[in-house]
């Protein structure tokens, strides 16, 4: 399968093709081989292989803490933005499998990390937050978790924070309005996030 993927490397690979490739591998290999295979794929210089590896690790990390640790510590420092998009999807895969309420300690752990890519895997991966079980019934918890990083030094992360809050404002405008009214808009970082989060508010 690796060889067949290699033939397609010059072409920009859509995310859904990566997901299809992961499903094919998961059905073709014994589960005990997945982790080593994912590590081998992640060592490849072509980002498509690392995207595929990240997807596989996300499936494994639902039950395998070594895979979860690799996602957090190694995948998160990959320089390719596409790999970081797959990390966000992988994190959501883990939370979906374990249950979003049961995953709250894990969500908070990642949100408290020093690496903005780890934090963004949460803020971006769980979008739209209030369509997820638990957060659908508890939008205020989602808003509080996301809003913690409104002033983060990473513009890349603040953009994700603002967009995630804007998503929620479509159904919970008053909750978002209450949140952003407390923000210190003289801080240019917070103002940047505010403009995204409050974009749909009247």
Language-model segments: residues:
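Alpha-helical scaffold domains
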Residues: 4-202
